[in-house]
Design a protein with these regions (language model features):
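Membrane-proximal helix-turn-helix segments that form the acceptor-binding/catalytic region
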Residues: 75-79, 131-159
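Short alpha-helical donor nucleotide-sugar binding micro-motif in glycosyltransferases
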Residues: 153, 258-259, 266-271
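Carbohydrate-associated surface elements
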Residues: 165, 186
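Nucleotide-activated donor-binding/catalytic signature segment of Leloir-type glycosyltransferases, i.e.
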Residues: 243-259
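Aromatic "clamp/platform" in nucleotide-sugar-dependent glycosyltransferases that forms part
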Residues: 279
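Short hydrophobic beta-strand element within catalytic cores of glycosyltransferases
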Residues: 296-299
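Conserved acidic donor-binding segment of nucleotide-sugar-dependent glycosyltransferases
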Residues: 311-312, 316-323, 332-337
């Protein structure tokens, strides 16, 4: 079947923040420059709405609808908006699965993480990290959710994962290996480029949703101890707790909140170090952006950041065998400026090679349209 368009399905979309929102927006905009039809089906806190921007048709379905109405409306919208189009599901997995069973249309999935674990963390049900959570005995409601999520992956033609860590989790959920494709998240190297000019007046920057597993409390404490200023970009349920912590320990922290994508390169250009302290990460867009802009980066081993950072070559991975913490990694970077300068250059090269949007988006498009 020759398909002349693409329909991207995502649970979140800008101005909401987060990796899936960023992907849905950049990928659909990119696809609209190649294909005659590009559309997005997503959710919103407001009323149902329909708009067109950058040549992309965007249908937003209200989260205020009751669950049955929302699922049916979503399934019908995905089906209706994907005539002659491939369907790429990056969120709303259960809605897409329902559409498949009711209306018989095939789709490709791109998963950002384990949505069952994320919901359990956000609701306070668990404090476990993503790996330990896999073997835990879940309450009935979550068992049902896990079964439904797995069914949505089994029903897909292909399952795209952005990191080796996530690939191993998906295999453990019982998805056939030959159905899984590893394609890293990627960024536009035109938008995020190295700018050596300008004053570096931000010591440490981090860009993420403010949720517990991002480990921002440790970053605040480390910056407080080392007397470094910290800029936190992003918003989320942990904001108040983090603001209180910063006050309590006298840290110099600037909470910027959610900002427009095109303001990020300027912030990166002013920053010395980027820290990503999450216990789970697929391929973090912010980490890729920072490295493309020549900001020395620190992240965690045993996460998708292992696919991005070559430890002690083009960055530092914490919580690994050599025992780096956020604080000791920052201290090491401050005291080894030659290493940092060399690492920044190598990081930019590696980003161009492995995380190039043009190359990776083409692969995703080919899989979705085949």
């Amino acid at each position: 079947v020759l398909r002349s368009g693409i329909c991207v399905v995502s649970g979140i979309y800008p101005p909401e923040s987060g990796g899936p929102a960023k992907f849905a927006s950049t990928f659909s905009k990119w696809a609209s420059s190649i294909l005659p039809n590009a559309s997005v089906v997503t959710l919103t806190d407001g009323a149902d709405s329909f708009l067109e921007e950058n040549g992309v048709r965007i249908r937003k379905i209200s989260r205020q609808r009751n669950l049955i109405s929302r699922y049916l409306r979503s399934a019908i919208s995905i089906f209706g908006d994907s005539k002659n189009s491939g369907i790429l599901v990056n969120g709303m997995f259960l809605e897409a699965c329902l559409m498949h069973f009711l209306l018989g249309k095939k789709y490709v999935v791109k998963i950002p993480g384990d949505i069952v674990w994320e919901r359990a963390r956000n609701s306070g049900l668990t404090k476990l990290n993503i790996d330990d959570f896999q073997n835990t005995n879940l309450p009935f409601k979550y068992k049902l959710f896990r079964a439904a999520f797995t069914l949505s992956l089994r029903s897909a033609k292909k399952v795209i994962v952005p990191s080796s860590h996530l690939k191993n989790l998906v295999i453990a959920w019982g998805i056939q290996r030959e159905k899984i494709e590893l394609i890293y998240n990627s960024i536009s190297l035109d938008n995020f480029s190295y700018n050596p000019k300008g004053e570096k007046n931000i010591d440490v920057i981090t860009v993420s949703r403010l949720v517990t597993w991002k480990g921002l409390d440790e970053v605040i404490l480390a910056c407080s101890t080392l007397d470094l200023n910290l800029t936190i970009v992003g918003d989320g349920p942990e904001r108040l707790n983090l603001e209180n912590l910063a006050l309590k320990c006298g840290a110099n922290v600037n909470f910027v909140g959610d900002i427009a994508q095109d303001l990020l390169p300027n912030l990166y250009a002013r920053s010395k170090y980027f820290v990503l302290n999450s216990t789970f990460e697929a391929t973090s867009y912010a980490l890729l952006e920072a490295r493309a802009c020549g900001v020395f980066s620190i992240a965690n081993s045993k996460t998708g950041s292992e696919d991005v950072i070559h430890h002690r070559v083009d960055g530092i991975l914490c919580k690994g065998d050599d025992g780096f913490t956020v604080e000791s990694a920052l201290k090491y970077a401050i005291n080894n400026q030659n290493f940092v300068d060399d690492a920044k250059f190598k990081a930019r090269e590696r980003t161009e090679e492995l995380f190039n949007m043009e190359i990776n988006f083409k692969r995703i498009l080919e899989l979705t349209l085949s």
